Amino acid sequence: MEDPDICWVQRFSNFERTFLLLSKALEFESPSVIERAGLIHFFEMAFELSWNLLEDYEEQEGITAKTPREVIKQAYQAELISRGHDWMNALQDRNLMAHTYSKKTAIAVEAKIRHEYFPLLDELYRLFKTKLEATK
């Protein structure tokens, strides 16, 4: 069986790459339709990897949660994340954008990514970057 430590470290590496791409995509202040679609896609990927990262870390800590909602709730209770309600909103918007597309919704979600969801992912990134440094 794979060492759980290795599992979350590998997941963090994948999350970090996608998070940094999302960060770059956010540099476009007035994105075109294509740039906005890319930004939303990077958010979807980063969000998916964020809850997978939390799931791997929680498993290492002896916490069992399998759905994104359960993982987020457990992470909030364990104080790995703050603003649990905002994480749940991000999950809802990620699911919405994965299954539907409208320009109006895309613009609204882009604004939420910029002002609400990216800061959540940034906080998670910084936490796990620190945890990774502590393992070296």
Where are the predicted features?
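Solvent-exposed interaction patches of small proteins and small membrane subunits
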Residues: 1-136
